[in-house]
């Protein structure tokens, strides 16, 4: 197993020096889910929630969050993202919505944290927009699905 990189020899937190790393194309894909009551799911699916287009607003929130990750996670590097894609998969039998966020950059450090942050904020936005009718929604299963590029190469969950 690799060493933790955000601590120096004295155990103090520090931001990792990526100055000597090569600029490479980097990609990360993350996902997470929110499960709700069937009636709430129908409101979201049909676009008839009182606050408006839940998934449209959640998509924009996810994109905004990916761009602000370094402001939220103390030791993350500010990254110039080159692409952010946000998709939703609706599973009616379980009243579950999956959010999938793909982030890309050409730089010296990965974009995993940006993808994960985008997923979390999308799910929180769905919760916020639907909580008036369903406070029991459950968010979960947030995870990195894959990452590509950089010194450590490619990684795919379950591979």
Curated annotation (Swiss-Prot):
GO molecular-function terms, A-Z: cyclic pyranopterin monophosphate synthase activity
User: Would the keyword Lyase turn up in this protein's UniProt record?
Assistant: yes
Q: Where is the active site?
A: 128
Organism's domain of life? Answer: Bacteria
| SUPFAM superfamilies documented for this protein | Molybdenum cofactor biosynthesis protein C, MoaC (SSF55040)
GO BP annotations listed: Mo-molybdopterin cofactor biosynthetic process
Known pathway: Cofactor biosynthesis; molybdopterin biosynthesis
Query: Which Pfam families does this UniProt record tie to the protein?
Result: MoaC (PF01967)
EC annotation from Swiss-Prot or TrEMBL: 4.6.1.17
Q: Where does substrate bind?
A: 75-77, 113-114
- Family under the similarity heading: Belongs to the MoaC family.
Subunit text = Homohexamer; trimer of dimers.
Q: What does this protein do?
A: Catalyzes the conversion of (8S)-3',8-cyclo-7,8-dihydroguanosine 5'-triphosphate to cyclic pyranopterin monophosphate (cPMP).
The protein's name is Cyclic pyranopterin monophosphate synthase
Could you tell me which species this protein originates from?
Answer: Cupriavidus metallidurans (strain ATCC 43123 / DSM 2839 / NBRC 102507 / CH34)
Q: Which gene underlies this protein?
A: moaC
């Amino acid at each position: 197993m690799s060493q933790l990189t955000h601590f120096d020899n004295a155990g103090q937190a520090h931001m990792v020096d990526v100055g000597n790393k090569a600029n490479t194309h980097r990609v990360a894909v993350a996902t997470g889910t929110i499960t709700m009551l069937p009636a709430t799911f129908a409101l979201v699916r049909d676009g008839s929630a009182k606050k408006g287009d839940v998934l449209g607003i959640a998509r924009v929130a996810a994109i905004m969050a990916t761009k602000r990750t370094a402001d939220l996670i103390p030791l993350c590097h500010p990254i110039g993202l080159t692409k952010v894609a946000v998709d939703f998969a609706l599973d009616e039998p379980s009243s579950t919505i999956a959010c999938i966020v793909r982030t890309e950059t050409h730089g010296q450090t990965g974009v995993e944290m940006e993808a994960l942050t985008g997923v979390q904020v999308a799910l929180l936005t769905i919760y916020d927009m639907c909580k008036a009718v369903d406070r029991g929604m459950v968010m979960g299963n947030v995870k990195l699905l894959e990452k590509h590029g950089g010194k450590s190469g490619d990684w795919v969950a379950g591979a």
